[in-house]
């Protein structure tokens, strides 16, 4: 839809600091998951290595494996706020490294990578002549914090593929609409695979996405709800001795450290039975994820239902047999 691409070009300039040609630099995709797959496909072959700051979105590891590549986790440290350093990247670099795959803001940790982390990443990518793929699905709710777009850093647009989604920020998950932004040269490398790999994006989904871009005021209620819920989660869950949760930096997720209580897989199963709540086991998010649980705070429209669930989790964890 040309109108959607034009609206996206305006948004990219205002929000992301990117000046793009809507017809040459934007590709509409049926959701960001297919967009990520498509972004990786032309650049990763059998045995090629992809550096993935971890914990990270599970599909990042899976997509690389499907293409015959080798996902290499760059394990980040909670004590550093899960920020990224040049030294961490260099420690994992080999002659087979082809790409860095970053989720920014991070899923599951909610980390917004700061300017120093992103500049270190940009310097690393340029020095080693790599491709950077960035998933920015959670960019819309950062609670006033600066959220830089790596492709906007000097020298990075030519070697960065940025994947965006309408599912997380605008609540259009059922419509399956996302988009890829990259240089002309990278787009030419990717486009030959587009129709056969990801198919078409529905017309109705594109119309809904355009309407959301033109009337963003509805997002104010989402922002209000997520602000309330992240603070309630922080307040309620940190009441449990041995449980540690940083105040979420972005989106509608929470990353809970339960390692002092015991095995995160067992605790996740326990909470289903004793709190009637299903949390994601951190082991699914790569190295550094074990001992953690991911909670989604955006399920209900009613804040009180979320608060009630948080209180059930708290009470169940207070009663959990300590290891």
Language-model region placement:
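Phosphate-binding glycine-rich loop
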Residues: 2-49
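Conserved PLP-anchoring active-site segment centered on the Schiff-base-forming lysine
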Residues: 42-64
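A short helix->loop->beta-strand "cap" motif at the edges of active sites that frequently abuts
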Residues: 48, 69, 127-131, 156-158
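A short helix-loop-beta submotif of the ANL/AMP-binding
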Residues: 66-72
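Active-site phosphate-binding strand-loop segment of PLP-dependent enzymes
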Residues: 72, 78-144
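PLP-dependent enzyme catalytic core of the Aspartate aminotransferase-like
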Residues: 90-91, 270-279, 285-323
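Conserved core segment of the aminotransferase class I/II
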Residues: 155-227, 231-236, 317-320
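Conserved glycine-rich beta-strand-loop-beta hairpin in the small C-terminal domain of fold type I
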Residues: 206, 210, 226-234, 245-258, ...
């Amino acid at each position: 839809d040309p109108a959607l691409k034009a609206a996206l070009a305006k948004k990219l300039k205002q929000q992301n600091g990117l000046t793009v040609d809507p017809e040459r630099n934007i590709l509409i995709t049926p959701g960001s998951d297919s967009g990520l797959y498509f972004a990786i496909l032309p650049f990763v072959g059998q045995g090629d290595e992809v550096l993935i700051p971890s914990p990270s979105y599970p599909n990042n590891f899976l997509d690389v494996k499907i293409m015959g590549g080798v996902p290499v986790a760059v394990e980040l440290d909670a004590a550093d706020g899960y920020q990224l350093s040049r030294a961490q990247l260099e420690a994992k670099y080999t002659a087979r490294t082809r790409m860095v795959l970053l989720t920014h803001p991070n899923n599951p940790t909610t980390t917004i990578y700061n300017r120093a982390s992103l500049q270190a990443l940009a310097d690393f990518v340029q020095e080693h002549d790599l491709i950077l793929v960035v998933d920015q699905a959670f960019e819309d709710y950062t609670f006033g914090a600066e959220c830089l777009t790596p492709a906007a850093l000097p020298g990075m647009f030519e070697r960065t593929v940025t994947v965006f989604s309408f599912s997380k920020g605008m609540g259009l998950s059922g419509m399956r609409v996302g988009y890829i932004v990259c240089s002309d040269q990278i787009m030419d490398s990717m486009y030959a695979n587009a129709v056969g790999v990801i198919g078409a994006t529905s017309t109705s989904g594109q119309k809904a996405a355009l309407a959301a871009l033109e009337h963003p005021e509805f997002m104010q209620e989402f922002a209000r709800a997520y602000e309330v819920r992240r603070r309630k989660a922080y307040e309620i869950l940190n009441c449990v001795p041995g449980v540690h949760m940083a105040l979420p930096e972005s989106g509608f997720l929470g990353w809970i450290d339960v390692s002092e209580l015991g095995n995160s897989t067992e605790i996740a199963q326990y909470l289903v039975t004793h709190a009637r709540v299903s949390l994601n086991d951190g082991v699914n998010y790569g190295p550094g994820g074990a001992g953690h649980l991911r909670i989604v705070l955006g399920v209900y429209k009613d804040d009180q239902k979320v608060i009630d669930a948080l209180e059930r989790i708290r009470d169940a964890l207070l009663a959990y047999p300590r290891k």
